[in-house]
Amino acid sequence: ELTVERRGIKRQEACSFPPIRLRFEKDEVKGSAFRGETSLKMVTHCKDSERFDQYYLLEMMAYRMYNLITDYSFRVRSLSVNYKDTVKGEVEADRFAFLIEDDSDVAKRNGLKKLEIDRIGPSRLEKTTVGDFSLFQLMIGNLDWSALKGPDPKECCHNVKLVAPRPLEKGDKIWPVPYDFDATGLVDAPYAEPPDHLGLKSVTQRLYR
């Protein structure tokens, strides 16, 4: 048994089939591929048109490209999903999707813990990873992120998770882990727009931030 929840902000507005979160009961997934998991994000096809499958294949590819650069990255797993109308009892679609690793698991793989904080200064970020991170965001044309603060002043960051040693001591470095690549120039989804304050006309324009 699992619980399915809608998630995302932009994609809930743009997609007829938005991304979802799967919540598992630990006892129900023992011995399965999902053992030990309690919650996973699933990226879906967004709209019924088959061309939208290509956008999310490209997004999944972005995650895997970053896996080659650093271990401080989200791993993903592709799926073929049968969606069934539980009222009619009919299979409505067989579509591509992918799962995103939980941020706690990313931290654990790297001997760290996920960090929840309102904001951080740039000097706290681990320099080598930040260099790789920034160049990767430029390469894929990602403008929709912040590793220092989020839209909610009580929560850092925007499309970035933080991992760090715990307890966090003065001088300890923090590692940024990016996610949500659907609005990048690499994917170039029809609903993707650059942030207004950057003064760009298209997400396919590159800007080093």
Walk through the language-model features, giving the residues of each.
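Phosphate/dinucleotide-binding and metal-coordinating scaffold of catalytic cores
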Residues: 1-209
